[in-house]
Design a protein with these regions (language model features):
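Intrinsic-disorder-associated, low-complexity terminal segments enriched in Asp/Asn/His/Tyr and depleted
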Residues: 10, 18, 22-25
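Conserved alpha-helix/loop element of class I SAM-dependent methyltransferases that forms part
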Residues: 80-100
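Conserved class I S-adenosyl-L-methionine
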Residues: 100-110
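Conserved SAM-binding loop of SAM-dependent methyltransferases across substrates and taxa
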Residues: 111-127
Length: 320
């Protein structure tokens, strides 16, 4: 292959991009391919798709077009789900190693992007009793997801038309599950997902909280009384009330989970920059972990900030 000079005046000793073999310079975006008169292939648009991923599934989820291409929005969605899968896959493998099969419940499933991708990448080739349950309040989404699972032969998937709160007592779900996920379950639905996970003795919980309005509403209601404490400056202004309430909600959730014996990891999702709700909370149950200190801190925070009326929402185990 013909080569150009190996250095440029501004970068001595460093190969310029065009100094590389032509085959290394051919990764162009579709628009540049068109300008260069090159054919635009489906592969040029789908290089992000994981090996073994069902193309039919990606088309059904409208991540790929009918001719197998991908636009910027669908590329972003796929990147988000794949990034989240990197966190969930080890939890799935640990549960499978421990119990031989995995039961996962996805709350606020929506169109079940996450559930379908998880099943396609992890579950479909394993011939065991593993199962994914998608919980969703919109009946039309439950129906369409059920039909898609049947069409793809994903027999280990079920979709239930329930609220997160109603699912706790539902007999359609097993008495115990391994993993609970809740992505952007609005406002208190995330707290209901936590209660569900605790009731079902889940080994792992994966949360991307959303719309934490309840705590902010209580802060706003009690603001006049709280202003005697200089700490109330943290939420005196309306914008700060909303932002502080959002962060405080997640802090209280983390303390609640720690009080129930979970080890917490809190991080930021990469590729979700378009959304301000990109905080990822992963909780793994650790038998024998200290529980008294996080429970004490949780109660003191509720009292100090004037949120005692939310004690039932952020319930902790009774201490001996």
């Amino acid at each position: 292959v013909a080569m150009r000079p190996l250095s440029t005046p501004d970068r001595p000793g460093r190969p310029a991009r065009d100094a590389r073999p032509d085959w290394l310079n051919c990764r162009l975006c579709p628009r540049r391919q068109a300008r260069a008169g090159l054919p635009i292939t489906a592969m040029s648009n789908t290089h992000e798709v994981r090996p073994g991923q069902s193309i039919e599934l990606l088309k059904a989820l409208h991540i790929l077009t009918r001719d197998g291409k991908m636009n910027q929005d669908s590329r972003r969605k796929l990147k988000q789900v794949y990034h989240l899968y990197q966190f969930i896959e080890p939890l799935l493998q640990n549960a499978r190693d421990a119990r031989g099969a995995v039961t996962l419940v996805d709350h606020g499933a929506g169109k079940s992007y996450l559930g379908f991708i998880l099943y396609d990448l992890f579950f479909k080739d394993r011939r065991d009793a593993s199962h994914i349950y998608g919980i969703e309040t919109r009946a039309e989404l439950v129906q369409s997801a059920t039909e898609l699972a049947a069409r793809l032969g994903f027999g280990g998937m079920s979709f239930l038309n329930l609220s997160v709160a109603d699912s706790i007592a539902s007999e359609q779900l097993p008495p115990r599950v391994d993993i609970v996920t809740a992505l952007h379950a609005c406002n208190t639905a995330t707290d209901d997902a936590i209660r569900f996970a605790l009731a079902k003795q889940a080994q792992s919980i994966v949360l991307v909280p959303c719309c934490q309005a309840e705590v902010a509403a209580v802060l706003r209601k009690n603001k006049a009384r709280a202003l005697a404490d200089p700490m109330a400056e943290l939420w005196r202004h309306p914008l700060h009330t909303r932002e502080f309430g959002s962060q405080l909600t997640n802090v209280l959730r983390c303390l609640q989970l720690e009080a129930h014996g979970y080890q917490l990891s809190v991080t930021e999702l990469v590729g979700w920059e378009h959304s301000m709700k990109n905080e990822l909370i992963i909780a793994r149950h650790q038998p024998g972990r200290p529980r008294r200190e996080p429970a004490r801190r949780l109660r003191e925070m509720l009292e100090r900030i004037g949120l005692q009326e939310l004690s039932e929402r952020f319930q902790v185990p009774a201490q001996p």
